[in-house]
UniProtKB/Swiss-Prot annotation:
This is Potassium-transporting ATPase ATP-binding subunit. It is a multi-pass membrane protein. HAMAP family: KdpB (MF_00285). ATP binds at D361, E365, F393, K394, A395, E396, T397, R398, M399, S400, K412. It comes from Bacillus cytotoxicus (strain DSM 22905 / CIP 110041 / 391-98 / NVH 391-98). Gene3D superfamilies: Calcium-transporting ATPase, cytoplasmic domain N, Calcium-transporting ATPase, cytoplasmic transduction domain A, HAD superfamily/HAD-like.
Length: 698
């Protein structure tokens, strides 16, 4: 608590506290319970009604039923032994099972996180405050939007809401995993509270902002469980390509008997089924859903809640990131560093009016002005009775201050805004005002002009600090081909100094909320995808306009509703990690698609020569792998085709290693590793399986 002396009386002002990000809560990929449940779900997903959602694996399951029939009724298959049909049937079953297991494992990790969130969702009693002041206790599940609720120290906040009265410390660890409490108070951008969190000091009155079942925690549980997950546009497009390839191979395999009959020999149905399954892209088909689910899970592990997979994918395609200066690029704790009187005014006069404009200002800047004035020993003699109405800062006016009961008005704020305010009252502007303001700006500070009536008394020098490592992070984004833009309400000189120090590509000075929307639209008109962060109600329109809008959990309900991602740690710089995760998701999908198609090329060289060697002896020259026999070649390729899916599950879950580099370098690297590797690995794998299979085939 800090005392502010006003003519011998004390006004207590609570100091704010800033928490650091908590450790990320996550479920291990191979947790025993998750794996056990994934096995059960993989079996349940064998239901054709479930399998039809994945057309590629549905084709494999149809093949399983065909070979199962051939195994049960051997007379339908006369060209191959019964053991071959049974083996093919089992391998196809495991192929489908492994694909289902990958998806169930990814979903299981989300469900484990959802279970921990459900533990925070308890039906407690709430103290409803009626219009006449009477307090009634009801179950939290009976609260409706608009209800006023009193929450005291030690009580759980019964539902989502906004603080309308009071100030308190709130423990949000049940939601964010961060143990340090955060301050919540009426007004401003930090009035939003979440149901399931607990008040640890003082008391607050909140207005409920959601009906039962519509709270933030309810939405989190649904999203983390994947109940609302839909396929993203990129996923749908890739699925369309894979289905097209499957249809092409299906037509080729169905018409193949016409060709073999012409050559004078017949191919058994089970061999045709095995050939089809080996040629269609089953690897990526079996892992595609798991990759998408795991991508959202990786975002969740960073304590970021993505409203859809589309938002995560969009983050991977981002071209421009728009960042607020305060709290994102800089620490955001601009503190009063000096007082500079202008014209013929004295520093004592400036100190008096600076303090008067800040005595009821609960912002960090306002409190720092009071601290500075008191630390320098300045005094002012204003009775508490003379203090009138506080004028809060607004983005439109860019000023705050107080209207005294005597009729005098005092303001502090952006130099340009205060000049306009003074000139509107026919006041004169000191000749050295701009010179001193420019001096502060060139040093990277922020000048706030102080005026009373139609006189400007001087400047408050606010100083902020760029967060360490920001220049390096922006350089990484530049290597990824992403442009960074800084938006700030500071004047152009201050903005330019901070931008140069931080290493951002462009900046927008004296930026108002509507300016952010204009900047976003301008970038989008150039065909670029834009990401931005925000926490205030005035950020909501821009968050909605951006392709990726990351809202802070500590921000207002309007900001969180407008955004498509919410950072539970309220760390604006996390947008950079979100972009990296999005790119990793797209790269993982692309790399495994490349690997899957390259696999098909290798399997082609394993199966086709073996199938036609009997009828066309010259095909033996293409049997470069030296496989044991035609049946061994087909089984080896089919077994490898099944085993590669579980072998790639950890990579699909974790994502491929990502380092910032140019698109061309990235493409060459992935083609080399996953294209060439996708051809080489099957040659080695199929040969090893053939050596084992050959031991059982005479």
């Amino acid at each position: 608590m800090r005392p502010v002396i006003v003519k011998g009386k004390h006004v207590q002002v609570m100091s704010s506290s800033k928490r650091e990000d908590g450790e990320v809560r996550s479920a291990k990929t191979m947790d025993r319970d998750i794996v056990s449940n994934a096995f059960k779900q993989a079996v349940l997903k064998l239901n054709p009604k479930q399998m039809i959602k994945n057309p590629i694996m549905f084709v494999v399951e149809i093949g399983f039923f065909i070979t199962l029939l051939l195994s049960v009724v051997p007379s339908l298959s006369t060209n191959v032994p019964l053991w071959f049909n049974i083996t093919v049937t089992l391998v196809l079953l495991f192929t489908v099972f492994f694909a289902n297991f990958a998806e169930a494992l990814a979903e299981g990790r989300g469900k484990a996180q959802a279970d921990s969130l459900k533990q925070s969702k308890k039906d407690v009693y709430a103290n409803i405050v009626k219009e006449n002041g009477e307090i009634t206790r009801v179950l939290a599940s009976n609260l409706k939007k608009g209800d006023m609720v009193l929450v005291k120290q030690g009580e759980m906040i019964p539902g989502d809401g906004e603080v309308i009265r009071g100030l308190a410390s709130v423990d949000e660890s049940a939601i964010t995993g961060e143990s340090a409490p955060v301050m919540k108070e009426a007004g401003g951008d930090f009035c939003s509270v979440t149901g399931g969190t607990m008040v640890v000091s003082d008391e607050i009155t909140i207005r409920i902002t959601s009906n039962p079942g519509e709270s933030f925690l309810d939405k989190m549980i649904l999203l983390v469980e994947g109940a609302t997950r839909q396929k993203t546009p990129n996923e749908i497009a890739l699925n369309t390509v894979l289905i097209s390839l499957t249809l092409i191979f299906l037509i080729a395999v169905v018409t193949l008997p016409l060709f073999t009959n012409y050559l004078g020999f017949q191919i058994d149905t089970s061999i045709l089924v095995a050939l089809l399954v080996c040629l269609i892209p089953t690897t990526i088909g079996g892992l595609l859903s798991a990759i998408g689910i795991a991508g959202m899970d990786r975002v969740t592990k960073f304590n970021v809640l993505a409203m859809s997979g589309k938002a995560v994918e969009a983050a991977g395609d981002i071209n421009t990131i728009i960042l607020d200066k305060t709290g994102t690029i800089t620490f955001g704790n601009r503190m009063a560093h000096a007082l500079l009187p202008v014209g013929n005014e004295t520093i004592e006069q400036l100190a008096k009016w600076a303090a008067l404009s800040s005595v009821l200002d609960e912002t960090p800047e306002g409190r720092s002005v009071m601290d500075y004035v008191q630390s320098k020993g300045f005094s002012y003699n204003v009775s508490k009775e003379e203090i009138g109405e506080f004028v809060p800062f607004k983005a439109e006016t860019r000023m705050s201050g107080m209207d005294l009961k005597s009729g005098e008005k005092v303001r502090k704020g952006a130099v340009g805004a205060v000049i306009d305010w003074v000139q509107s009252q026919r006041g004169k502007i000191p000749t050295d005002l701009h010179q001193k303001a420019d001096l502060i700006a060139k040093e990277g500070g922020t000048p706030l002009a102080v005026a009373a009536g139609n006189r400007i008394f001087g400047l408050i020098y606010l100083k902020d600090t760029v967060k360490p490592g920001m220049r390096e992070r922006f350089e990484q984004l530049r290597q990824m081909g992403i442009k960074t833009m800084m938006c700030t309400g500071d004047n152009p000189l201050t903005a330019a100094t901070i931008a140069k120090e931080a290493g951002v590509d462009e900046f927008v000075a004296e930026c108002k909320p509507e300016d952010k929307i204009a900047v976003i639209k301008a970038e989008q008109e150039l065909g670029k995808l834009v990401a931005m962060t925000g926490d205030g109600t005035n950020d909501a329109p821009a968050l909605a306009q951006a392709d990726v809008g990351l809202a802070m959990n500590s921000g207002t309900a309007a900001a969180k509703e407008a955004a498509n991602m919410i950072d539970l740690d309220s760390n604006p710089t996390k947008i950079i990690e979100v972009v990296a995760i999005g790119k990793q998701l797209l790269m993982t999908r692309g790399a495994l698609t490349t690997f899957s198609i390259a696999n098909d090329v290798a399997k082609y060289f394993a199966i086709i020569p073996a199938m036609f060697t009997v009828a066309i002896p010259q095909m033996e020259a293409l049997n470069i792998m030296g496989l044991h026999s035609p049946l061994s070649a087909i089984l080896s390729a089919l077994i490898f085709n099944a085993l590669i899916i579980p072998m790639l599950i950890p990579l699909a879950m974790k994502g491929i290693a990502y380092k910032p580099m140019s698109s061309n370098t990235l493409l060459f690297r992935n083609l080399l590793i996953y294209g060439f590797g996708g051809v080489l690995v099957p040659f080695i794998g199929i040969k090893l399986v053939d050596l084992v299979v050959g031991l059982f085939i005479s």
